UniProtKB/Swiss-Prot annotation:
Record InterPro entries: NA-bd_OB-fold, Ribosomal_uS17, Ribosomal_uS17_bact/chlr
Gene: rpsQ
Stated family: Belongs to the universal ribosomal protein uS17 family.
Example of a GO cellular component annotation carried by this entry: cytosolic small ribosomal subunit
Name of the protein: Small ribosomal subunit protein uS17
Gene3D superfamilies tied to this protein: Nucleic acid-binding proteins
Length: 79
């Protein structure tokens, strides 16, 4: 099964080698038929402490690195 890749915004970089990423998605409410925005926070491994709060990043699934971290940050694409 392929690993999932999500895009989000860093909301916290206070942990050592850890960032908290907020991922937003839109769904259609099953009863109201209205488009609703949902968000979820993921703890992701950032080996180099390279990302700061407010940056848009991509994360990929990985083997568990700790109790909360099962995602790691994809490296920045070089232009």
């Amino acid at each position: 099964m392929p690993k999932r890749i999500l895009e989000g915004v860093v909301v916290s970089d206070k942990g050592d080698k850890t960032v908290v990423v907020k991922v937003e998605r839109t769904i259609v409410h099953p009863v109201l038929k209205k488009i609703v925005r949902q968000s979820k926070k993921y703890h992701a491994h950032d080996e180099a402490n390279a990302y700061k709060a407010g940056e848009a990043i991509r994360i990929i699934e990985c083997a568990p690195k700790s109790k909360l971290k099962t995602w790691e940050v994809l490296p920045k694409a070089s232009a």
